[in-house]
Amino acid sequence: MSEPIHTGELGIVEAVAKMLSGIEPKSDAEMRDYNFKTYIAPKLEMFGFEERYRKDGLCDGPDERCKLQRQKLAKLTNVIHGKGAIVALVGPRGTGKTYIASQFVIDLLWAELHTSKCSWIRYEKLTTIVGRLKAFYGDMGTISMEKLEAYRAFLTKALDLLIIDEIHEVAEDSKHKDRILTDLLDTRYAAKKDTILISNQSAEEFERTTNPSIIDRLNEHGGIISCAWQSFRDKPAI
């Protein structure tokens, strides 16, 4: 057990030095892990990411799918610069599209660590957005107009980056989907706010079934990134 520090005898500087001398310095890996757990992971939770997406780093190793994931992340990073880009990650289930999007956010948070920059980001499924915003398009439901307008302003103006998942899995409220999505994308683009769309469709099916005005926005201001490799759920990475 260490001896008590008497600041009257040693002085403040000496007391602090003696206290610090007993602290074992952390390695770079330990500091990164500490910063991730205390700063980045809580933000990912606040942004709406499920626990499985709150992990630092994509899969690594010789598996070709890991290499492809990193290539798509690099492409996503090259497109999004805080100027209203609209990008779609498309491909079969289990290829890691949401992991790519979450890693993009993680990399952004690392870049902002120990700076005054603080990006506001949200991950939502389209069913959630449509369920809340459909009142704007004729179905008032039970939500108040004041709360509705606040939520729409949050999505269109406050968020630096909005990630919308499962954009083709809206059935009951599909009549509102295209109007809501088009309005969100147009308003966010005008405000120079970036948006990432995620779909389990192939690139061809996505282009065929998506509103032409949305495809035009994608072609003009971002693009479609196809993740067309075998699902990680079918076969573990090597």
Give a label for each model feature.
Residues 70-73, 109-158:
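Short glycine-rich substrate-engagement loop in P-loop NTPases that contacts/grips substrate
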Residues 83-102:
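Walker A/P-loop nucleotide-binding motif
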Residues 84-88, 121, 161, 194-196:
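Residue-level preference for the first positions of well-ordered beta-strands
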Residues 103, 107:
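Active-site signature of alpha/beta-hydrolase-fold catalytic machinery across serine-
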Residues 1-74, 224-225, 229, 233-238:
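A short, basic N-terminal segment
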Residues 76-84:
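Phosphate-binding P-loop
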